[in-house]
Amino acid sequence: MATKLYPIGMQTFSEIREEDFLYVDKTEFIYRMTHTSGKYFFLNRPRRFGKSLLVSTMQSYFEGKKELFKGLAIEKLEKDWTEYPVLHFSLAGGKHMEKDQLVRYLLYILKVNEEKFGIVNDSPDPNVRMLNLIKTVYEQTGQKVVVLIDEYDAPLLDVVHEDTSLGVLREVMRNFYSPLKDSDRMLRFVFLTGITKFSQLSIFSELNNITNVSMDTEYAGICGITKEELVTEMHEDIQQMADVLGLSYDKTLEKLKENYDGYHFAWPSSDIFNPYSLLTCFSKRKVDSYWFGSGTPTYLLNMMRKYDFTPIDLGEQMDASKDDFDAATETMTTIMPLLYQSGYITIKNYDPETELYTLALPNKEVRIGLFRSMLPHYLAAKSAMCNTTVAKMSSLINKGNMDGALQLLKTFWETVPYCDNTDYEGHYQQTMYIIFALLTNFRILVEQHTFRGRTDITMETKDTIYVIELKFNKSAQEALDQINNKHYADAFALRDKTVEKIGMNFMIDEDKAIVLDWLKFGE
């Protein structure tokens, strides 16, 4: 039973503070941002990373609700606590809509804000309504207006891969945001959040002075939970988790890091934990996959197919310039910007000499979630059975019984229906990579470079390195011969582990069944 109240899924700052839920203090970031020379700010972070709570915290701050900030950093920093009128728009409800539906939704959220200030306006044009709302509130209160826009890109995410629909909905949103430029003298602060980055020209029209703080080191920890925050503010939670798991404090922290840590949105940056997964883990007292299971990234899988981005590509580290991944998604020529901005890959290193960033999957939760979501694309209806097979294989490999694990795999493949579009070696290599990548207890490398070529799959356990070569409609002996003739195993000769060489071959028999055969060196 959880002894602390965790704000899982909660987005309202006042509710969290008034009902004594855990709050990780981000108010120093808010003070810093609201006391610079800028007026327009943009931040993108992955879903469920605390963006909406950040916006709600800003709203309470600008509304002068000092009592909610007792004991927080901003209590000592802010002296005036001036109350400003706040317009808060959430576009979260604008998903899966056609043009007319989206316009009606925009009119609805405008009406909610109008009613807050006793304003009546029946114009059918969101542009006119927004401009009038800001002007009237400014004149009515005598104070400059604060505009907070949460999930600004929500109406566009589902159609980011559809050029026609994207253009239509993008124009609707441009029309909605355009009054911000004309209202400049009446605005105190404007803050927009979202998952992805759309170009200023396409969305914000003439609003060319917006400051994007998404990759600024000073704001790297504005969302999410840093390691420092975890070990200082949730020390007891880690210890309680350790007691449940039967592990030491340090081993439990290591397990939490392995599953939920690893994000960096700037470099240098503290390690950032996924807040939704971490808090859900503490609440349930169970290490599991929470973030990925909270929303199926259909649009992401669609884009991966569009850009021919494979599981092997996803599993490898990528070197890229900032412009390659911190780019507008609607003009991207690779999947990298969407993967990065959605939180499926993250910054792992930076080389100041080349100005190249190294990006990779952040942690175990994301890796397993992504690969599991890909299984239906490669195995159709058999993906659920594959998860069971993988779990059993992992147990056998841990016991050193690779033959038993491969026999399970052979039996599984015999249940997979043959399709003409899978009649090539690459399909089986990609599928096998997913299967092996789901063996989470082991280190898996695909097409690892050696001085004589590249191995198809290398798997490393605590005491054994398996060098695996795959063939299609050839023979396991031919695969094994390639390992030997090209001396793939020599790359591991100095490692203090047993090296086993395995040749595998897939064949389609006369009954259109998929048959897996394998041969180990020395047998």
Across the structure, where does each feature detected by a protein language model lie?
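Structural motif
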Residues: 146, 464-466, 500
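Conserved catalytic cores of phosphodiester-cleaving nucleases, focusing on short active-site segments
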Residues: 432, 455-472, 486
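Active-site metal-binding core of divalent-cation-utilizing nuclease and nuclease-like domains
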Residues: 136-141, 435-462
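Metal-dependent nuclease catalytic cores in nucleic-acid-processing enzymes
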Residues: 176-183, 337-345, 431-437, 482-502
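Domain-level recognition of nuclease-like catalytic cores that cleave nucleotide substrates
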Residues: 491, 497-523
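Mg2+/Mn2+-dependent nuclease catalytic core
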Residues: 167-171, 472-489
